[in-house]
């Protein structure tokens, strides 16, 4: 296997531990024809078939993921198994401190039952096999990641996104691959490694990486910057690229490199999430990948640190389910949804939208209804269930501070909530990003986050910046936009009935304490987890003495 890997030592440990895992016949999942068959396979694959009254428990119990997370130091001091332990950590969405991350032990049984089959299905359905190559990019590591030592004993720590793809490499064993961090995707040395691969069938990278290649200005800037940071040993391809830049100049050479990269990757399938892609960005990606509209080749996926690969738009090659933005639920765990405190298995659910709860085994212990904090929508639950590819985050309490405008008054003692879905006593707010997009399109508003403030026991303030088109500086217009963009009658009526006051201020309502570039540098240097980069569309402030407002 030809590999260009920024950490081959970690991959070697995973290969030694997991390369003998038997492959799964994931194509048979697509032949599942009934809910009963799906449930039976879920119980068999997950190991939950041995759990008494599993269906009853799956409609009544719930598990906080922190209850089975590990104290890293305590776990390592007591570890006694013969193989190198591997731990994965969360992305730090709720807390910006590395010390606050949740850690999970990746036991061999969990990898065999959940991670290996799911990742094999995702990549093989995208076209990767032992005769083809893969281009893979992963998040910048935190400072604790990689092959580490505790009291002279080795252990491996990784984001689940890096771990999952390294497990996949151990199982599928492609003939060649590149494996680097997102931040180096436009580095000339990394590009030269991609040029050294043949038969590239899969690119696993976020949309921003592809867009970075597709944007010639950004690509040129980063290629030029990377010339100051080239390795001492330069492979022949890299030497040729450097010579071309010297001869043609950076602008012309970057254009040639972009065209070669586009051609090199044009037969590949991209594995990425498409939820946040605008049509403009889609067009950039189509042009770079040489795709016709309606003939895009990509695979969407949903993987969580607590449970592994849960769903993906796997297929037998037509990618139609991907283009519909749907995902098949893998029969590797037992999943339920919770709607208004009622829990139902997704294979039996009458309610089609709710909070995702997933049951799996952890060694000999059954973890029933792990609360992942995400909201899913079921599109089909006869046979192999299908869910909407847009997974939204239920509201959660932030554990780091933000900067609020001094143009309004906030409570003395309060909590901050963020997310995509807020269930409040008097109304629900679902996908507020849609409202921001409408404000940008209809009102020329330059804002990426709004603020909802509980101003007193009876009412709220929904705060907007006033640097918008004058036609939008009216409550009536805001009501129209909320009605047309969010389709949430309770919220609209709340404004009409003065439960929610519309407030305009000559300032941005909310922002990070540091600049975006400062935070990004911290993440890239491993000083902060990547979750801190997420700017949520809505932040909600609730006084601590009024916490029962959020349900």
Where are these regions (language model features)?
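Active-site glycine/GP-rich loop and adjacent strand/helix microenvironment
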Residues: 2-18, 170-551
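Active-site diphosphate/adenylate-binding microenvironment
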Residues: 21-87, 98-105, 114-128, 143-144
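Short loop/turn segments at strand-loop or loop-helix junctions that form parts
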Residues: 89-92, 137-141, 203-208, 466
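Short beta-strand->loop structural element characteristic of the AMP-binding/adenylate-forming
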Residues: 100-102, 157-158, 162-184
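Conserved ATP-dependent adenylate/AMP-binding module captured primarily in the ANL superfamily
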Residues: 112-132, 185-198
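Conserved AMP-binding loop of ANL adenylate-forming enzymes
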Residues: 118-166
